[in-house]
């Protein structure tokens, strides 16, 4: 894994922790960012990605939830906080960071779910984002599927 990939993975991990704190503790995003800057070595993190996700998810949470809800079999408020943060992060990246391949977005979210989510949380995260990807990345998903044939 390249150094840049490691930094992006670390950024997603920190963003997940920050978004969890935002959801559970209700702290402000700027306060969370300041705490994370003090408590973590941000030299080892893709700071642009961290900030994009940290600020992008809360500022567009209503839109992200509207995109996600059709693919979730219960109210989003009933989803585990870690898994909800992960599918929101994934939806944000699928929608807003088109330079990142959709498979990478899904895989990174699944790996974080395996590390931090419930027993089958990774399956839930994979299922939701896999269904959402064709809606947000229609041409990219279609091209990937046609290569498989």
Curated annotation (Swiss-Prot):
Pfam families listed in its UniProt record: NusB (PF01029)
GO cellular component terms attached to this protein's record: cytosol
A GO biological-process term: transcription antitermination
Matches recorded under SUPFAM superfamilies: NusB-like
Family, as annotated: Belongs to the NusB family.
Job description of the protein: Involved in transcription antitermination. Required for transcription of ribosomal RNA (rRNA) genes. Binds specifically to the boxA antiterminator sequence of the ribosomal RNA (rrn) operons.
Protein's recorded name: Transcription antitermination protein NusB
């Amino acid at each position: 894994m390249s150094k840049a990939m490691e930094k992006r993975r670390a950024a997603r991990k920190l963003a997940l922790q920050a978004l969890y704190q935002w959801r559970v503790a209700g702290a402000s995003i700027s306060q969370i960012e300041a705490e994370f800057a003090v408590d973590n070595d941000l030299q080892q993190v893709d700071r642009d990605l961290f900030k994009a996700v940290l600020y992008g998810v809360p500022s567009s949470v209503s839109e992200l939830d509207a995109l996600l809800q059709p693919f979730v079999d219960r109210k989003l408020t009933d989803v585990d906080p870690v898994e909800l943060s992960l599918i929101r992060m994934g939806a944000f990246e699928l929608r807003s960071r088109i330079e990142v391949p959709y498979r990478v977005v899904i895989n990174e979210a699944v790996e974080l779910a395996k590390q931090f989510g419930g027993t089958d949380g990774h399956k839930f995260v994979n299922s939701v984002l896999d269904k959402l990807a064709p809606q947000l990345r229609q041409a990219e998903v279609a091209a990937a599927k046609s290569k498989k044939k």
